[in-house]
């Protein structure tokens, strides 16, 4: 029985030939992402901007999100978000912080509850103040930075320094483009978005390490081969695995977008974008960087000798 293959084996695609196009293209996208972040900004959710969240459940039938949105907007409590989640009877109503402090915020909560009426059960009320939201921003940013530094320190000691630099540049490229994606699409940026960014970083580094490990293996084997040709051979060797992995994860994320509800929609869409960007950067950003950093086959550590790798004979 033949195994399922999404890419042909023994391909000879000249990936490194496109490095003169991929680098300017990626630099342009990175600049656009930074400009979007600085000028447009992120659509911070209640976790980071502060405000009130009401989790409701319709007592009879399906929740009418359009009617709930109209009721909340009529009360003039600021920006209102109404999202379904879980079952058809469940809905979340969000609105921002009110001028006047805690007293004004609680008064707005009471007005919304009274306007909704007895048709809905209020299952949860959550108020996030500006101080708490600021602490969440700092904690989330610190968590992302620490995780990236820890993994990149591992790469620095695990591989040659050129490999670590290439991985750092590819990871920062993926982070910038993901931030730009959030700013452009206006997806709500909340704590699940932080989880998405950390997952994208992990996926990107995993794809990068797989490619770098194959490149190092080939450099030990073919020390005299030109670096660009050797990297092409290495990337072509792992491309079937890369396509299979990305496709599998992509199909799972499509299911989350279709059936997961609004609560994890931003996470799922960000992950889809991140998988695409991470796959691209591992091939067209990290690998060509080794050429520009002057990595050659004779600079890579020697492979283990056959005597060292041959298993010892056991006595009968």
Question: PLM features: residue spans?
Answer:
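A structural signal for conserved, well-ordered secondary-structure elements
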Residues: 1-316
């Amino acid at each position: 029985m033949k195994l399922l293959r999404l890419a042909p084996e023994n391909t000879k695609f000249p990936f490194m030939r496109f490095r003169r196009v991929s680098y300017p293209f990626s630099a342009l996208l990175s600049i656009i992402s930074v400009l979007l972040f600085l000028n447009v900004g992120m659509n911070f959710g209640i976790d980071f901007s502060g405000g009130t969240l009401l989790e409701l459940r319709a007592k009879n039938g399906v929740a009418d999100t359009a009617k709930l949105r109209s009721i909340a907007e009529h009360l003039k409590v600021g920006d209102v978000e109404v999202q379904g989640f879980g079952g058809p009877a469940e809905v979340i109503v969000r609105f921002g912080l009110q001028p006047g402090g805690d007293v004004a915020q609680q008064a707005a909560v009471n007005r919304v509850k009274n306007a909704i009426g007895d048709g809905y059960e209020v299952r949860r009320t959550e108020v996030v103040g500006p101080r708490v939201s600021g602490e969440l921003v700092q904690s989330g940013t610190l968590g992302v930075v620490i995780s990236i530094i820890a993994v990149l320190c591992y790469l620095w000691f695990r591989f040659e320094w050129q490999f670590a630099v290439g991985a750092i540049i590819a990871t920062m490229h993926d982070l910038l483009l993901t931030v730009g994606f959030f700013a452009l699409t206006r997806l709500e940026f909340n704590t699940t978005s932080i989880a998405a960014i950390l997952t994208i970083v992990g996926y990107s580094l995993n794809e990068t390490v797989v490619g770098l490990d194959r490149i190092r293996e080939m450099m030990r084997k073919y020390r005299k081969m030109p670096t660009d040709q050797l990297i092409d051979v290495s990337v072509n060797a792992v491309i079937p695995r890369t396509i299979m992995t990305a496709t599998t994860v992509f199909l799972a994320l499509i299911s989350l977008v279709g059936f997961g509800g609004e609560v994890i929609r931003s996470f799922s869409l960000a992950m889809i974008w991140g998988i695409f960007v991470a796959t691209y950067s591992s091939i067209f950003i990290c690998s060509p960087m080794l050429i520009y950093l002057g990595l050659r086959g004779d600079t890579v550590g020697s492979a283990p000798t056959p005597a060292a790798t041959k298993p010892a004979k056991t006595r009968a």
